[in-house]
From Swiss-Prot:
The chain crosses the membrane at residues 3-23, 67-87, 94-114, 119-139, 144-164. Probable serine protease. The active site is at S100 (nucleophile), H143. Keywords: Hydrolase, Membrane, Protease, Serine protease, Transmembrane, Transmembrane helix. It is a multi-pass membrane protein. It holds the Pfam family Rhomboid. Belongs to the peptidase S54 family. This is Putative rhomboid protein L523. GO terms for cellular component: membrane. Disulfide bonds: none annotated. GO terms for molecular function: serine-type endopeptidase activity. It is found in: Membrane. One of its GO terms (biological process) is proteolysis.
Length: 171
């Protein structure tokens, strides 16, 4: 059972449909952390929820605790990287929301843990970022910060090479 996956999905849905506004705090750091769980509309929530679920096989590979730690690590680091980028370049400060930074981080964890064809897969991930520069409403900064956080996670807490080979998302 993918407990962590279902808990995260439940949190995303509850926050989306909640009448409470968790976003307006007095702390910029808290605001950046909370943005990850907000979604612009139902389509955004469904797209991110589906993408996250497709990566939930990592919970089977890593175990519940390590998968939860991985998500929390990527979430916090990518949020802080985004805050640092917006602090360093205030003109780039935009309202960014959504779980996709964490999703991109998990994709990096998956790709870096592949045995064969890892380089080709990573090149595909990098190429997937390019169209985002030409489409409005997509936070490529959030995706890149998530990718960086995923890379840092793999460097600090590597999965055995090939541990995710032949793994597929199961419904």
């Amino acid at each position: 059972m993918r407990y962590v996956t279902y808990i995260v999905l439940l949190i995303l849905v509850v926050i989306f449909f909640s009448p409470l506004n968790f976003f307006n705090t007095n702390s910029e750091i808290i605001n950046y952390l909370i943005r990850t769980f907000y979604h612009a509309n139902l389509q955004h929530l469904l797209a991110n929820s589906f993408s996250f679920y497709m990566l939930s096989f990592l919970e089977d590979v890593m175990g519940h605790a390590k998968f939860a730690f991985c998500i929390i690590f990527i979430w916090i680091l990518s949020s802080m990287l985004l805050l640092a980028e917006h602090t360093a370049f205030p003109s780039r400060k935009v309202y960014t929301v959504g779980f996709s930074g964490v999703i991109f981080g998990l994709i990096v964890v998956y790709l870096m843990s592949l045995g064969k064809n890892r380089g080709l897969s990573i090149a595909g991930l990098v190429l997937s970022i390019i169209p985002q520069f030409f489409v409005s409403g997509i936070s490529y900064e959030g995706h890149i910060c998530g990718m960086i956080a995923g890379f840092v996670y793999v460097v600090l807490f590597p999965l055995p090479k090939g541990s995710v080979d032949n793994q597929v998302a199961m419904f």
